[in-house]
Amino acid sequence: MRKITALFAMLAFAAAPAFAQDAGWETQGLTDDSITIGVMGPFSGNASSYSKAMVGMMAYYQKINDEGGVHGRKLVAVQEDTACDSAKGLAAAKKLISQDQVFMLQGNSCSGVAVALRPVVEESGIPWIVAQAVSDSISAPLARNIFHGVPTGSANGRAMASFVLSKPDTKNVAIIEHSNDWAHSYSDPAKEYLKEQGITPSLELTMERGQTDATAQVLQLREAKPDFIIAALYEAETAIFLKDLKKYGLGEIPVMGTAGTDLENTLKRTGDFDTVKNYFVIHSYVDNLDGPKMEKWADMIKKYYPDEELSTFSFVSIGSAEALVSALEKIGPDLTRSKLIAALEEVRDFDTGILSDPITWTPEDHQGVKGSAVAGFVDEKPTVLKAWGQPY
């Protein structure tokens, strides 16, 4: 009987997560005057523009530090470059967890990298707030230590389809997308929403990454005559697609893009307002980038990073950093990793003042932001919209 009991005890110990084995784990990366936070992002490579999200988040850390920190502790960012590459991302995560022994992780661009990191981070048990990457697979199925602080692909995909159908008399919807998981994370929930409303896409087209001509796809669209097009494409391919739409006389058809594109950047890429005048994008914020509600955040980033050129990506991770600080403040000075996880699960309807939708995390659901606004050009000015013709 003793042998059986001992065997069960050994099995239970082996099956328990690493963070339950060692009390010292609870305060690893924590001192009396600092909280170390591992910040991973593509600080180099072709996707380095996404790292602006990490810069905005770290500017917020510095703001909090200048105000005295959280219960006397400064937020200390330990940066690691993923270059938007899964292998480099895995190496970065392992270094931060095992070598640097940070208290928690926050950040991460590039969904493919973040999905690859999930098993390592989940096994480690350390808190991880995903602050830019959108793939649902990062935070679902539920992992107790992983939290999404931005709208996921499914939230954005449904928001895209909802906006499309808010345009009166929209019945014929076409979709063009990349063939990767990132694109599907938008298009699949968009199609689910359309189906719920009794609409099946009239056309589903693929445009691969790196493709420099969309003539074949545009000619098919000309035959289908859609009322609206959903485009799950990266910025470079979006610009090519919009140019070819105009070239073949389809420039009046509105196009709904993802959070992976930026309205102003798309205008810069095309170099022609007529090409983008009917282009709309998911917009996670309460105002235009140069609007009064965003001014204090822009000033904050410029204070700490005066040479930083601001874009849509610059602001996306700040909201989840605010939610983190709020949770840390509520815990008090006696901080542990388990207490932080529990406090994050108590965040309800947290108004960040920057994201268009609040953050709510519960023990059953760690995908905290359930909706998004849309941005488009109205009277040739970028405008945040709740629905077709309805400013935010």
Locations of the language-model features?
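Short, low-complexity disordered leader/linker segments with a strong preference
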Residues: M1-T36, D66, P391-Y392
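Extracellular/periplasmic Venus flytrap/periplasmic-binding protein
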Residues: A91, D136-S137, R144-G249, N288-K296
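Beta-alpha junction/loop-to-helix N-cap segments that form part of ligand/metal-binding clefts
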Residues: D22-W25, S49-V55, E67-A140, M207-A214, ...
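Loop/turn elements at helix/coil->beta-strand transitions in domains of secreted/extracellular proteins
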Residues: D33-T36, G72-V76, Q99-M104, E123-P127, ...
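Periplasmic-binding protein-like
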Residues: L96-N108, I129-A131, V173-E177, K225-E235, ...
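Extracellular/periplasmic periplasmic-binding protein-like sensory domains
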Residues: L245-I318, P382-Y392
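Extracytoplasmic "Venus flytrap"
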Residues: G24-M58, E80-A87, S109-C110, I176-H184, ...
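Segments of small-molecule ligand-sensing domains
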Residues: K303-S314, V325-V384
